[in-house]
Structure formats: C-alpha cells, structure tokens
Amino acid sequence: MSITHVKAPTSRLHFGYARCDITPPVGIYHRMWGAARHDQATGVHRALQADIVIAEPLGGDASQRMVRVQLDFVLLDNDQTLRLVTPVAASANVAPDQVIVTHSHSHSAGFFPANRYTMPGGDLIAPFLAEVNAKVAAAAAEAVATLADATVTYATTQCDMAANRDYWDDEKQIYTTGFNPGQAAENTAVVGRVTADDGSLRLLLVNYACHPTTLAWDNTLLSPDFVGALREVVEHEQNAPCCFYQAPCGDLGPKDGFVGDTAVADRNGKQVGHAALSALYSMGPPQTDFAYTGPVVSGATIGTWGWSAHDQARQAETIAFAGGSTDIPLDLIEIPTIASLEQDLERFTVEQTAADAKGDAVAARDFGARAERCRRWLGRVALLPQGKTFELNFSVHQFGDAVWVTCSAEPYSWLGSELRRRFPDLILFISPISGNAQVAYLLPRDRYGQGLYQEEPSALAPGCLEALTDAISAKISATTGHQAKD
C-alpha cells in the first residue's frame, strides 16, 4: 500500500530555557591528559557554557517539571553534582531528583576531581565551582520565568566528523585509541527546533556522538572543543541559541583529533554545525506532517506532496508527557586496592622524575601518564561503594514523538544505535555522562579482554552495557507503549 503520510516528529510541551557562561579562570588546574606536561590553563580558546532546559506538559504542570542542566565540562563527581543540583532544584522549585545534569565532555575544559585541589591551579577549583553553582541556579530561575507552550520539531541527519577510535596497531600488536578507518561509526545527528506558539524561533538542539578530544596534551587553553564552533555556526545562521547534547561515544572520537591546534577543533565543530543546519532546512512549519496531496497532470503526471497541519488525533500524540529516573544494579569488577595503586603511583612518579633528570622527554611523558592513571583510579575507588554491585542511574522521558534518554558513565555508541534499531518509530535524544563518572566506560561484552584502553579505567563488568540497554528499552516501552523490535 502506498505511503501517503510521513510524520514530522514533534513534541508539544511547556518549555523554558536559559544559559550562562561557566568559563573557568585562567590558571585553573587543566591537565586532563596523561601525556600533557602542563598543569594549568594558560588562556581561553572559546567560552564554556551551561544550558538549562525545563520541560512540563503542555499548559504547564510544575509537579511534572523536568530540569535539564547541560555543562561544557568533562564531568563532575557525585559530590560536586549534588552541590550543583541542590541550589538548582531550589531555584526551579523542584525536588533534586527532578534535576538531571549532563556534560558535553570536553577534555580541555579543566579537570576538577577533589584529588586535584592540591595540585597547581587546584586552589581555584572549589571557588570556581561555587560560582558555577550560583550562576546555574540563577539561570534555572530565568528558565522558569521563560516557561511557555512550545513546539519541538525534530529531524535526523548524518555527520562523518566522528569515527571509531579503537585502532589496531598491526606492527606493535596493540590497540591504540585513534582513528580506525576499518570500522564504520555511528554517525546519527538528531536536531530539534524549538518554536514559540507565535512562530518565533526559541532554541536549536543538537544531539551527536563524538568525544570532544580534538584538543589533547599539546593544548593549554580552556575550550569546549568542537562544540564551540558548532554552536557558533548554527547560531549565526539561525539567529537563535544552540544547545549541544553529547550522545553515547565511548568508542567514537574526531577523525582529525588529538592535536594542539584550536583551528582543527573549530573545523570539526563547523562540520557538525553544517550537518545540523542541513537537518533544520529539511523541516516544514511547526505542527505539520508531510502528506501526499494527489496527482497533477503535466508533461508527466506529478505526485504532489505538501505540509499538512496536525489534526486532533495527531495533536494528541504530540502532547504525550511521561517518564522519570531510575537505577539499575550492575556488577562491578574486582576493584584495585588503594595500597597497590598508591605503590604504583609512587613508583611511576619516581621514574618520571628520573627520566626528566636524564632529559628523556618521551619516557618522562609515558611514566607521567601511568602515574595519572593511578591517580584517576584512586579517585574512583574513593567513590565506589562496598560490595559487588553498583546502582547506575538513567532516565527516560517521553515528549510526544520523542524520547529523551540520559544515563550515567560513558557507554559505547552501540547503546544509541541499538536503541534506535529497537524503536525505529521514535526520535531518541540520548545523552550519557550524567553522573557516576567513577565507573567510566561501558563496553560491549565481546570487546572485553582485547587490550582496549576503555577497559582499563572501567569499574563495571562485561555484560553491563547490554543490561543497561535492556533496562532502558524496557522503560521506553513502559513509558510510551511502543514495543521494542527483536
């Protein structure tokens, strides 16, 4: 049977938005890379941003209010997140569990774990984060003040800026983390256009999977990485703010990355920005679908299509509003002991000092990187619970034809592609790195035991990614009534 009606995915809801600048001070602790030889930021490439989105059912209902805070940080630990969520919840007049914090994950935004406070520039971290908490809370109040009925229209496109980064070095017989041209990558970009009821453009949303690791150990500037130029391209063309949401990217990074040149980060961002614009140009007016309007006899008999306003039944579909957050218990691996990690840290630090004294820059860099891995594990161990399981948080919210998903940690892109395979009729806006940073990556079961970097810092056992995917899938089905495809 011929298809005569193509839905333009739509959410009709009560919507608020605000943003603020959260650029750290120059001199703050910055070294995210084990191979870096600097500790402190020496300048600013582009400003860092916090975006606050508030969603309620159409017409408004504060009891169902969802507050989403998006930060241009690599991550915050659970205590830092709680210190942010508490004032934001108060400003937005919601319970803390109605506030969801996600991160763009830029590796050049500064690095703020508690065990960095005593390092060069670490003294600036606590006062800076206190300032961020106040700024974001004030922005949350601004977002509440902007709440009004709105329409979000979605479209998907593809962008090849990101690539698989699990590269097998045949000569050295090891996996490295870098561009892997032999493996196809998840390249879906989801774009949302938020319009007011008077037709004015309020906000553009971009959801795309790529580690913001264009800039690496040679970069000493504070930067949102490719996200800054992405926003600039979209905002310049559309004359409206743009909010970027990271998507599952544990195995994805820029094809052209791990450099110190900020021009490369800007070029990567422009590539994603123009892909987002291509999706925006494919959209029709708000609250319309694309419908067949019949034949017209011309030199050929033309099949004509046009944008058709939503009827009452279609409007009812687009105002669906439901969901929330939940936890899933996942198995932990055998966690390294603090004593063994401290012993390794001391040994690598001594070896780094000796290599520096000999003028062996490469060896010093390598020993410094190994010492950094120990510091990160010590930070994780301090935050992991006693016992053999970890309660990992995720959220599922249905907004009309779209489902917004968040989850903790850093899952491989398989999470996104598999959920889209199971729910082809839904728009999925999927964002990881929502707390619980201490558990690090979630790899597919068959990727463990191969020597991949992502396994080294990960606290969760094989099978956890699949368990999380099944839990999210079940929650989507329960929330929306859509059954997952086998």
Which residues are covered by each model-predicted region?
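Non-catalytic substrate/cofactor recognition surfaces at enzyme active-site rims
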Residues: 2-486
